[in-house]
Amino acid sequence: MMALLQTFNHKGIRQLKYREKIWQVVSRIPRGKVATYGQVASLAELPGYARYVGYTMKMLPRGSKLPWFRVVNAKGELSFPKHSAQYQTQQEKLEAEGVVFSEGRFCLRTYQWMID
């Protein structure tokens, strides 16, 4: 039983560290720029964890100030189902920062955050 508890605690601590790394990267994405899930994972030193980045964004507490909406997929699209409330919210927030959409997409080359 004690070994199981230690394993759980270790896994929980590791996941918290992963989330903190992801949050730090996302907090640095500038206004008017986006980063892909894979890019955030790589910058957080978690290569191959793109899906975990998505999960972490999904689990943000309501009212979080983290700019979750700046994290997008590698196709230059939003990952929410089109016409959903979440899709509309994300698109509106990005457009308010100057990201231009055309037919539900934007030019990733133009808006992708590149670290100097």
What are these model-derived regions, one by one?
Residues 4-116:
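Nucleic acid-binding interface residues in structured DNA/RNA-binding domains
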